[in-house]
Regions:
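Residue-level signature of mid-helix packing/kink "hotspots" within the transmembrane helices
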Residues: 30, 58-66, 155-156, 263-267, ...
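Helix-to-loop junctions at the C-terminal end of transmembrane segments
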Residues: 64-76, 270-282, 369
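Cytoplasmic membrane-interface "Motif A"-like loop-to-helix N-cap segments
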Residues: 74-85, 279-292
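C-terminal ends and interior cores of transmembrane alpha-helices
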Residues: 86-102, 292-306
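Cytoplasmic helix-loop-helix junction between adjacent transmembrane helices
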Residues: 112-151
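Helix-loop-helix hairpin linking two adjacent transmembrane segments in secondary transporters
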Residues: 147-194
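C-terminal transmembrane helical hairpin of 12-TM major facilitator-type secondary transporters
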Residues: 283-330
Length: 413
């Protein structure tokens, strides 16, 4: 199928749009976690219940990630990006209004955060497909690494802005911030996004249309590995701010700045991991190495926190970087293996499994912290990346699957 070529500048501009649309969605999805101190102080919630409220956007994403992926496979990236961003903005605005009515509105606010998560799920598959579709294989690791910085940068932006808005103007004002930036993303996506080329379904070879989950365990194993590796990431992101404030006496502003710095470093780590995978010509071997490093960093964090060492802050920074570095590699591998007619659903399945675990992590570990303390929680968390190490498939297996069963996502045939 012939398609009008785009310039290198246009390709990178599309990457920028995909990055910022996903970044702003992540401000909404992850920013509520930085309102846990406000929920505790102003509404009297304990850590477990505040963690549950903060996880509502993530729970909302779980039932819609695969359906959004199906819509992307059928209707294209542009439609999904602008519609999902607009709906996320509307839900965030409604939540901001509802929370102003006081503690009796927390159930309504939680429901609206859940609905916003359902809408925000749209950006994950759509932006990933947009990047994979417009970049050649030898640049995909780097490009997807850049796109995957949306999550840590979104977390960092949320940590920088939302706690201070909540402290000075209340939780409603804090929720207005993701409403505004997601509305901006909706307009930009509607105007500027170009869907990548792919062959019509009627002209596609049978192997491109075949279900990539049948006859192979590769995608299932990548999903399982990613679920295990997201636990330390979610733990560090959710409780870093409150840990620094309650255990080390940091102010909300100072703790927010440090969290933002760690997220920027994490974003750079994702880019470096993507470039590393391009140079190696492998996506999965680096994931195995990162899993080992994540386990080591969480164990060291547990030990330094147990002995009340000042080095625990530095170890937290290192853990924040290591635990996010694998995401782009798994995302790229899944899109390449699944092909142009299944990558939306495969990426949706990837995010569904990850975000279900991400949603469970705050309340479960919040309860564990309340009972046993932070060092025990950090040590238990280290078990998850340990379990992931032997599950990572060999790169030769995924290469064989791509070579025999899949076309290149988004590329004309």
């Amino acid at each position: 199928v012939e398609t009008k070529p785009i310039s290198t500048l246009r390709r990178w501009s599309l990457l920028s749009i995909a990055l910022f649309a996903t970044l702003f969605s992540n401000v909404f999805i992850n920013g509520v976690a930085f309102l846990i101190p406000t929920l505790h102080r102003d509404f009297g919630l304990d850590l477990a219940l505040a963690g549950l409220i903060s996880a509502m956007p993530k729970f909302g994403m779980v039932p819609t990630l695969i359906p959004w992926g199906y819509v992307v496979d059928r209707a294209g990236e542009r439609f999904v990006l602008w519609l999902g961003s607009a709906l996320t903005a509307a839900a965030a605005l409604a939540a901001a209004i509802s929370i102003g009515k006081g503690s009796h509105s927390l159930v309504l606010t939680g429901g609206l955060l859940f609905l916003g998560g359902m809408a925000a799920a749209s950006s994950n598959s759509a932006s990933g497909r947009l990047v994979v579709g417009w970049f050649p294989a030898e640049q995909r690791g780097l490009a997807m690494g850049i796109r995957q910085t949306a999550q840590p940068l979104g977390v960092g932006l949320g940590a920088l802005v939302m706690p201070q808005l909540a402290d000075s103007h209340g939780m409603g004002a804090a929720l207005m911030f993701p409403a505004a930036v997601c509305a901006l993303a909706a307009v930009v996506c509607a105007v500027a996004v170009i869907d990548p080329p792919r062959p019509p379904r009627a002209e596609a070879p049978p192997e491109d249309l075949a279900n990539p989950y049948r006859g192979s365990q590769i995608l299932w194993r990548i999903h399982a590995v990613s679920v295990l590796l997201v636990v330390p990431q979610a733990l560090v992101w959710t409780f870093a701010l409150v840990w620094m404030m309650s255990e080390h006496g940091w102010s909300p502003a100072s703790a927010g700045v440090l969290v933002t710095v760690t997220q920027i470093l994490g974003a750079l780590g994702r880019i470096a991991a993507g470039r590393w995978s391009d140079k190696m010509g492998a996506r999965l071997r680096p994931i195995r190495i990162i899993a080992a490093a994540a386990a080591a960093s969480m164990l060291l964090l547990a030990f330094t926190d147990l002995i009340d060492s000042a080095w625990s802050i530095a170890v937290l920074i290192a853990a924040s970087v290591v635990t996010v570095s694998d995401n782009g590699l798994a995302f790229t591998a899944i899109a390449e293996i699944a092909g142009p007619f299944w990558s939306g659903r495969a990426l949706g399945a990837q995010n569904t499994s990850q975000l279900l675990m991400t949603g469970l992590t705050p309340p479960v570990f919040g309860a564990l912290i309340g009972v046993a303390g932070y060092p025990v929680a950090f040590a238990v968390c280290a078990l998850f990346p340990m379990l992931a190490i032997p599950l990572v498939p060999a790169d030769r297996d995924s290469a064989n699957l791509m070579g025999t069963n899949r076309g290149s996502p988004g590329q004309p045939v």
